[in-house]
């Protein structure tokens, strides 16, 4: 069974059971805590957490996923892959264990043809409910209980959690010892995990956390690895050899002159090439491009590992273009974007291969030299300096150096490497502002400093002033200029400026510089070197010359909006420390007009109630109209006064302290409002994790907060009018409507089923006698639910008890058919699965099944009469033998 068919059967199985089929989301995660989607449930996370109402009660999907935490195992084991597809069915407060377990079991046994005797199940230690359901499907000896580590699931943070049940396939005694999954997970292969979200967990590390309560709405989240299922159903040894992976594996062998299966060491490298090429193609198709950070670095690492392994196997020419073409051919049916955007996708990979070729050649030479030197000194460790040089000079990622060192029998002084990297980061921090505005040559600023001295910042006291132009530099190359004409961008240094340069998370001031005969727009303000302020400007008119006087004027409205955000951030910082403890210190911030972003240290999510309390406290402080005061003092005195200093920041002997009344006191060089009342209002919008131990809250300040609240009020007002309810009644009213709608849908389904089954007696009475077999063929309306088609066929068969019977019920549009037979008919060779294959499938549809019940799909209205005629012919043929 090819992978596309497995995928189709999975989705069709759940579509017939009322699930909405949801297309795969992009690999680029919308979740701020993730770089890439790494599990099938990630796109549904907001619904499970209750952040958003689920658009459907039931859903099914095949989600693209990338997981790189164990990338070193890729190629070495039969199971590890960096890209995989996760089949999942989900329920959002609709069905639970009693339905989820049979749904999975039916697909495995009826849809995929697993023998029930080969299946095992595990349940959580005290999950009697799940075991009771499984006992109706499997004997007790093939159901095992396991502890929290194996059979209890949570997201790793406070929120939904619950027991899970895993389904295993017994591959046979050739793969290991008997005893079930507890004894040997090499022999007993996990094929499906069913998670029952029924509890809410509290804070705690690892598996040590309390269960706070049972959830009011219980959810289902399941995961069945498509590649793993294909490995089993296609009878191959590992997931690299299935139909969508093997072509890439063979292409890698052909391009490197190595035959897969001839040498175990070569096989590992070929599998790495095949795996990483597929992953890279999928990432690029979702818009990821190679870079040195984030998901771009994941892609770059994949491509470079694949390229290096190809070179090690003997490929002297570029290989990415052909490998990506093979990936497109193998997977383009499922993911047409691989074919539609083939030129762009391949172009990204080829460009990276070309860029890395010289890096790999030179870097490998440097590595080999360093390795020889280490051995000549009797060392088994590659120095941190050598690893840093490879990274800094030749673009070798440290993980590649570690991999090469391990292959050479060496370790790497990682601590030394990290020290040198930290030193470089500190140096880079000093010139990051200059690089942002385009200048990378800091030497251009030294003569300006020597000639004119430091820039005097006057922006705390004034928003405009007359200043002299003491420096002009080109943005592209940093070269000194004498003049700049209209519509050009240049860097301007003034002897004194009211413009605040970006620093401490506060965005820079913008505005204008006016001079005799012209004007420039200030686009950005940075400190490329200490004591010097550089204004990136665009000349709007006239010619700006070195030495002229300009009238520098800050955009006052923007400055006030940014200052409101900065003062609000101080209040947010203090409020979180008061609510969560002294450890909730600032990890970063961004203060822009009307909006703030505040990162802080915390072990887990902030409960919504605490977030609401923090917001209330901030607005209460704002209403107190506390004076905001800034003063300069010594570090020692600031510490004595209890001023908060930000971790990782460096301060001089003289520091600036900002007070907000008696509520907040911090070391800060930013601009602020004069009193807390000038904030207007603060609205916190979101809180989420951005990394382990670090949370991020975002909010609106001032007019932006008021506008947001006004929109929310309007929305509530419109909902109140539409639902004829007061605002405080809306939740109950919506809950009631949703409940009644669900009840109505169920009643409608019941009535539809009753209407269909009402004709069962007449159909049985009208059975046609064919060679001693009662044959019933019936069409039902196209809108009939799949389950009702099946129920009607079974009901008619039951009414024909005592006679050999074959019953076929098809939907009028040809989208599905169900054929059932009884024991007597099967005794005469009439098996339902064979009848479907020899009638429905032979005439253009698809289908099959068990001897007693089988079904088909993918037909058309014209197919139905022909199939019924063919069925009667098959009955006559078999029964008369």
Curated annotation (Swiss-Prot):
GO biological process, one term: alanyl-tRNA aminoacylation
SMART domains assigned to the protein according to its UniProt record, in alphabetical order: tRNA_SAD (SM00863)
Free-text comment on the cofactor: Binds 1 zinc ion per subunit.
Keywords: Aminoacyl-tRNA synthetase, ATP-binding, Cytoplasm, Ligase, Metal-binding, Nucleotide-binding, Protein biosynthesis, RNA-binding, tRNA-binding, Zinc
Requisite cofactors: Zn(2+)
One cellular-component annotation, GO: cytosol
Annotated CDD domains: AlaRS_core
Binding residues annotated for Zn(2+), in chain numbering: 566, 570, 668, 672
Localization per record: Cytoplasm
GO molecular function, one term: alanine-tRNA ligase activity
Main location: cytoplasm
Enzyme Commission (EC) number: 6.1.1.7
Coiled-coil features, chain-numbered ranges: none
Reactions catalysed, as given in the entry: tRNA(Ala) + L-alanine + ATP = L-alanyl-tRNA(Ala) + AMP + diphosphate
Protein family membership: Belongs to the class-II aminoacyl-tRNA synthetase family.
Comment block on domains: Consists of three domains; the N-terminal catalytic domain, the editing domain and the C-terminal C-Ala domain. The editing domain removes incorrectly charged amino acids, while the C-Ala domain, along with tRNA(Ala), serves as a bridge to cooperatively bring together the editing and aminoacylation centers thus stimulating deacylation of misacylated tRNAs.
Function in brief: Catalyzes the attachment of alanine to tRNA(Ala) in a two-step reaction: alanine is first activated by ATP to form Ala-AMP and then transferred to the acceptor end of tRNA(Ala). Also edits incorrectly charged Ser-tRNA(Ala) and Gly-tRNA(Ala) via its editing domain.
Protein name, as recorded: Alanine--tRNA ligase
Lineage: Bacteria, Bacillati, Actinomycetota, Actinomycetes, Frankiales
């Amino acid at each position: 069974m090819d992978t596309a068919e497995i995928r189709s059967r999975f989705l069709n199985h759940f579509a017939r059971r009322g699930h909405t089929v949801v297309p795969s989301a992009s690999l680029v995660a919308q979740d701020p805590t993730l770089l890439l989607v790494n599990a099938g449930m990630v796109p549904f996370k907001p619904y499970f957490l209750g952040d958003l109402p689920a658009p459907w009660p039931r859903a099914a999907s095949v989600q693209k996923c990338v997981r790189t935490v164990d990338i070193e195992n890729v190629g070495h084991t039969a199971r590890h892959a960096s890209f995989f597809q996760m089949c999942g069915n989900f329920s959002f407060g609709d069905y639970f264990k009693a339905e989820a377990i049979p749904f999975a079991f039916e697909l495995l046994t009826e849809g995929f043809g697993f023998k029930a005797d080969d299946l095992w199940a595990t349940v959580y230690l005290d999950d009697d409910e799940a075991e009771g359901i499984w006992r109706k499907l499997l004997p007790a000896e093939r159901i095992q209980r396991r502890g929290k580590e194996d059979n209890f699931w949570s997201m790793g943070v406070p929120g939904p959690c619950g027991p899970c049940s895993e389904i295993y396939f017994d591959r046979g005694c050739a793969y290991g010892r008997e005893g079930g999954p507890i004894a040997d997970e090499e022999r007993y292969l996990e094929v499906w995990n069913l998670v029952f979200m029924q509890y809410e967990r509290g804070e705690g590390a690892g598996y040590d956390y309390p269960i706070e309560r049972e959830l009011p709405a219980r959810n289902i989240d399941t995961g069945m690895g498509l590649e793993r299922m294909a490995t089993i159903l296609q009878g191959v040894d590992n997931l690299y050899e299935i139909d969508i992976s093997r072509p890439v594996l063979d292409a890698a062998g052909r391009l490197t002159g190595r035959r897969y299966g001839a040498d175990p060491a070569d096989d590992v490298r070929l599998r790495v090439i095949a795996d990483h090429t597929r992953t890279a193609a999928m990432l690029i198709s979702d818009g990821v491009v190679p870079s040195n950070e984030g998901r771009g670095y994941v892609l770059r690492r994949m491509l470079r590992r694949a390229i290096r392994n190809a070179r090690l196997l003997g490929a002297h020419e570029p290989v990415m273009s052909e490998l990506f073409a093979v990936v497109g051919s193998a997977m383009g049916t499922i993911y047409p974007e691989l074919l539609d955007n083939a030129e762009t996708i391949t172009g990204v990979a080829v460009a990276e291969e070309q860029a890395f070729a010289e890096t790999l050649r030179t870097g490998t030479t440097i590595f080999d030299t360093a390795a020889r030197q280490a051995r000549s000194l009797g060392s088994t460790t590659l120095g941190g300096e050598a690893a840093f040089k490879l990274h800094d000079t030749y673009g070798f990622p440290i993980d590649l150096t570690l991999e090469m060192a391990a292959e050479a029998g060496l370790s790497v002084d990682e601590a030394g490497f990290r020290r040198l990297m930290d030193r470089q980061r500190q140096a880079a921090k000093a010139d990051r502002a200059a690089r942002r505005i385009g200048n990378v040559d800091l030497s251009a600023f030294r003569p300006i400093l020597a000639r004119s001295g430091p820039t005097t910042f006057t922006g705390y006291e004034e928003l405009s002033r007359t200043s002299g132009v003491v420096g002009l530099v080109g943005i592209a190359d940093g070269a000194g200029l004498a003049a700049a004409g209209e519509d050009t961008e240049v860097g301007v240094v003034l002897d004194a400026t009211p413009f605040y340069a970006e620093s401490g998370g506060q965005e820079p001031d913008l505005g204008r510089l006016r001079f005799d005969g012209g004007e420039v727009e200030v686009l950005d303000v940075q400190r490329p070197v200490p004591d010097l302020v550089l204004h990136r400007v665009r000349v709007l008119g006239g010619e700006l010359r070195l030495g002229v006087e300009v009238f520098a004027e800050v955009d006052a409205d923007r400055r006030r909006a940014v200052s409101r955000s900065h003062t609000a951030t101080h209040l947010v910082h203090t409020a979180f420390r008061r609510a969560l403890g002294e450890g909730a210190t600032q990890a970063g911030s961004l203060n822009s007009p009307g909006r703030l972003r505040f990162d802080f240290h915390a072990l887990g999510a902030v409960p919504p109630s605490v977030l609401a309390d923090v917001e209330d406290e901030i607005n209460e402080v704002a209403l107190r109209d506390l004076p905001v005061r800034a003063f300069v003092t010594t570090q020692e005195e600031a510490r004595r006064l209890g001023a908060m200093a930000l971790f990782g920041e460096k301060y001089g002997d003289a520091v600036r302290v900002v007070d907000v009344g008696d509520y907040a006191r911090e070391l800060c060089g930013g601009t602020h409002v004069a009193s807390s009342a000038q904030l207007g209002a603060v609205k916190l919008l979101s809180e989420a994790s951005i990394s382990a131990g670090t949370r991020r809250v975002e909010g609106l300040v001032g007019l932006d907060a008021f506008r947001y609240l006004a929109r929310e009020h309007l929305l509530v007002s419109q909902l109140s009018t539409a639902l004829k309810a007061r605002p405080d009644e809306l939740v109950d009213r919506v809950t009631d409507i949703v409940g009644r709608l669900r009840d109505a849908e169920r009643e409608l389904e019941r009535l539809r089923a009753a209407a269909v089954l009402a004709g069962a007696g007449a159909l049985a009475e009208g059975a046609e006698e064919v060679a001693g077999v009662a044959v019933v063929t019936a069409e039902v309306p196209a809108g009939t639910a799949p389950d009702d088609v099946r129920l009607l066929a079974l009901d008619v068969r039951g009414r024909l008890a005592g006679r050999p019977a074959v019953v076929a019920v098809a939907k009028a549009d040809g989208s599905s058919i169900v054929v059932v037979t009884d024991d007597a008919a099967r005794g005469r060779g009439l098996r339902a699965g064979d009848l479907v294959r020899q009638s429905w499938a032979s005439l253009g549809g698809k289908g099959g099944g068990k001897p007693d019940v089988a079904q088909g799909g993918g037909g058309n209205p014209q197919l139905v009469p022909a199939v019924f005629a063919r069925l009667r012919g098959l009955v006559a043929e078999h029964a008369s033998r």
